[in-house]
Amino acid sequence: MAEHKNITDPNIHEPKGVATATSGTTYVANGSGSGTWGVSPVNLTGLVIERLVDGFSTATSQEPTGLDTTLQIEFGAGETSAPVTLDATGKVTINVTGTYRVKLGFAVGRIGSAGVASIYIRALIDGVQVGQSVHWTIGSAESYIPFTDEAWLTLTAGTEITYEIIKDSGNSGVDAGGLFQSNPTTAGWATNPSASIRVERFV
């Protein structure tokens, strides 16, 4: 009998368990001399993205009241799913531990007044800032700057996520600016909200 190492195709036998393995799966060693068939970490076949909440503000604007005063950003009336809750204040609460994708949209701008506005937005988890602040300096009296962002986050049940905006007085920043809704006059086109959020996960 030939040694196994010397056997060539088509006489080489298939991997252990392949006859009953599901299509698209791979054999992964368990470190104890055996293994199991499952979905490969780089093979997303069979996975779909589940949309959990999809909120947007209906406010004409979201502007902090004065310089250096924080305003929590809201995303509409709120929505609830089993894994995630979005309330009317803009707070996202994680109900089920897992990995989530958070997608954001903000319409930053200003209306009227002279001088340069200095606008910052930040994210907070359980009341503590995470990541860096995002900054805009807006010198025109009529300006609109769209901003989008997304992140995958592994979060435990009970975690609360919020977003804040501020008109900063640093560098002679003026009391102007915030988030603004815009409405197309062309029939059939939807409003662009001042702020929107979507939370998703793989299932």
Predicted regions and their residues:
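Extracellular repetitive beta-rich solenoid segments
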Residues: 2-42, 115, 168-171, 201-203
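Extracellular jelly-roll beta-sandwich "head" domains, especially the C-terminal globular C1q domain
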Residues: 41-203
